[in-house]
Amino acid sequence: MAWPFTPLVTFLSKSVPKVTHTFLNSLQSAVNAIFAPVYHRRPSIYVQSTNGSQVLVFAASLTVKDSATGEYVYIEQVGRTVTTAWPASAWRYLYLVSTSGVASVEVSSTAPATGTAGPLFKTGDETRRYLCAVRCDPGGNVVKFNMIDGRYLWLADNQVLTGSVGTGSWGTLSMSTFVAPHARRVSLMARITNGSGSIGGVAFRSFSTGGIQLNADANSFDERDLTIATAGDSIEWNAPATTTVDVLVRGWEE
């Protein structure tokens, strides 16, 4: 196997080996190869808010580009409590910022840039390392939630469809109140009231293709859980006119 799995030079005790440009450049290349995949991976993180005003952030140690020096600096893991004047009915995004080595959390209305493997930085600003998304209700309170490594779970009954009667055709189900625009998967609970004389229910789909059917017995009702891939904060639903549907968002993933 090649460098860095095998040494370029084997140094001996009390010897003065020649250090070539090839050796030094190889060291730098190896450091780059190790650093790049670590830097472009989201840190392990746990976030929660249970009182409507504070967001508790526990992020593992990570590297961020310092906003003052432009150098890449190491930030030790530590718990942080974030408070601010939260807006009404809006998303806010939390970013870790280093200023001359001093870490802080920025609350912004600017969403993160969407990377291939998930969001890493604030859109247009690599010095802002993305931590999490926060939803605020009409009263300017944080909607209660917890999040582990990009998987969000709501702690309340958050409905996005209430007593809606099917039309027999596909329609848009907007989940923007409780699902961020950069979501990649969403967990739902559907309450199905089937008024027909046979088994039936509601179907959901993403990307305008396929469909996942959730059914209830004839002249009955039931609840079904569903996790479905998405490319944002909306999917589609379809039910016959004999079916009434309620949908709750249980959580989402980025």
Feature map (PLM): residue ranges:
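Beta-strand-rich interaction surfaces with strong enrichment in secreted/lumenal proteins
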Residues: 81-84, 161-163, 224-225, 236-237
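Beta-rich globular "head" domains
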Residues: 39-43, 61-65, 87-98, 146-213, ...
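Glycine-rich, low-complexity segments
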Residues: 25-56, 111-169
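Extracellular "spike/adhesin" assembly and maturation modules
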Residues: 1-37
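Glycine-rich, compositionally biased intrinsically disordered regions
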Residues: 29-113, 149, 198
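Noncatalytic modules at the cell exterior or secretory-pathway interfaces
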Residues: 126-141, 186, 226-243
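Contiguous ligand/interfacial binding patches
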Residues: 208-248, 253
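Short, flexible beta-strand-to-coil junctions
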Residues: 95-111, 135-138, 188-197, 238-242
